[in-house]
Amino acid sequence: MEAYKSEFIQFALSRQVLKFGEFTLKSGRISPYFFNAGLFNTGADLARLGEFYAKAIQASGVEYDVIFGPAYKGLPIATTVSVALFNHFQIDKPVCFNRKEAKDHGEGGQLIGYGLSGKILLVDDVITAGTAIRESMTLIAQNQAELSAVMIALNRQEKGKGELSAIQEVERDYQCQVLSIVNFDDLMTFIEQAPEYQQYLPAMRAYREQYGVK
């Protein structure tokens, strides 16, 4: 596992963004871990978060022209990612956001920032049902742009209602890559190498056996 992945997991644990234990998800599933990126909520947190996204983007080799952050959680992520790419890699990319509701005054419209053109890198925290991606795809298509890839913090590698995960459905429906800083397998690798967390291994393995994608 790359060093930045292990560092990200440690960072998420230190900020209580990632917790191990027993948690009831909205789906009703009992999960042995919980991830809430909304707890990255200080300037220092967001600066580090952006750096991890930037490292993952660079490691992926993905090609893109514009960074797009879907409302609302994607807005601060897109901002900190663009700053981190410039500060750490001297890569200067334009940023675009959308409003949930279009404005008919001021600058108007549904988009804020650079606009959508060329190859789009969409950044968000997680993909649960894929709703934000589907809404974003409408905007991207309306602007004759192309979704190059989606970058999220955590890929749960978990089935939805069928055999595919929401991420696999997005990849299938839009022929794009969904990339992540870390995934469930990375969490497992981290736990296996960290004695203080090995008590959670049986529950994590059982969860993967029951809900993990093939």
Swiss-Prot record:
GO MF term (any one): magnesium ion binding
Reaction(s) the record says it catalyses: orotidine 5'-phosphate + diphosphate = orotate + 5-phospho-alpha-D-ribose 1-diphosphate
Enzyme class: transferase
Residue positions binding 5-phospho-alpha-D-ribose 1-diphosphate: 26, 72-73, 99-100, 103, 105, 124-132
Protein residues bound to orotate: 34-35, 128, 156
SUPFAM superfamilies: PRTase-like (SSF53271)
This enzyme's EC code(s): 2.4.2.10
CDD domains for this protein: PRTases_typeI
Functional summary from the UniProt entry: Catalyzes the transfer of a ribosyl phosphate group from 5-phosphoribose 1-diphosphate to orotate, leading to the formation of orotidine monophosphate (OMP).
Name of the protein in its database record: Orotate phosphoribosyltransferase
Protein source organism: Pasteurella multocida (strain Pm70)
Organism lineage string: Bacteria, Pseudomonadati, Pseudomonadota, Gammaproteobacteria, Pasteurellales
Gene: pyrE
